[in-house]
Design a protein with these regions (language model features):
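Bacterial N-terminal signal peptides that target proteins for export
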Residues: 1-9
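Short, low-complexity N-terminal intrinsically disordered segments enriched in polar/charged residues
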Residues: 8-54, 102, 145-157
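Surface-exposed, charged secondary-structure patches
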Residues: 23, 28, 58, 71-117
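Second-shell loop/turn segments in exported
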Residues: 34-38, 58-65
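Hydrophobic pocket/interface hotspot
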Residues: 36, 48-49, 56, 72, ...
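Short beta-strand segments enriched in hydrophobic/aromatic residues
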Residues: 52, 110-112, 137
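Short beta-edge strand/loop motif at the mouth of beta-sheet-based domains
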Residues: 67-69
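Short beta-strand edge/turn micro-motifs at domain boundaries
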Residues: 117-147
Length: 157
């Protein structure tokens, strides 16, 4: 009886441990994005750009900033070399999936040191069993009460 109980306990423990490690698809996307943000903060260029799909696009806060991965990497390279990159702390993330579960889109709020509160949104594609960032869009949300003034400044620019 004691031996049977031990075997049963070991099996239940193994099952519980494997269930605890299993991530939902949304958690898996979150882990990819978290690692991507952490790679930027650590100035780990290879890890950071390894998260992009080959035909990925990064859109920055300026209207002129629509970069292919190669263009974005060229712009960012000096920052990674100097170890003076950026730190984004994500929260309030939402993830959705296509019906075939091969495409995911998300939005997240970001606490940043330089820009304050930002929003990131984007699309990931499943490629060879790995989620890759196909598009990322960084924006600075403007409170509605300030929009008119900001629009005037943009027009005057």
């Amino acid at each position: 009886m004691n031996r049977t109980f031990r075997i049963l306990a070991i099996c239940l423990f193994a099952l519980a441990a494997s269930t605890a490690r299993a991530q939902s698809p949304a958690q898996h996307i979150g882990a990819v994005l978290d690692d991507w943000h952490q790679a930027a903060a650590a100035a780990d260029e290879a890890r950071y750009f390894g998260h992009f799909a080959p035909n990925g696009v990064f859109m920055g806060t300026d209207a002129t900033e629509r970069w292919t991965v190669a263009e974005f990497r060229a712009w960012a390279k000096p920052r990674f070399q100097k170890k003076s990159t950026w730190t984004f702390k994500p929260h309030d993330r939402h993830v959705e999936f296509s019906t075939d579960r091969k495409t995911a889109w998300f939005d997240e709020m970001l606490d940043t040191l330089d820009l304050g509160l930002c929003r990131g949104s984007g699309v990931l594609v499943l490629s060879g069993g790995t989620w890759k960032i196909a598009q990322y869009n960084l924006s600075v949300p403007i409170p509605n009460a300030m929009v008119d003034g900001v629009v005037k400044q943009i027009h005057a620019h």
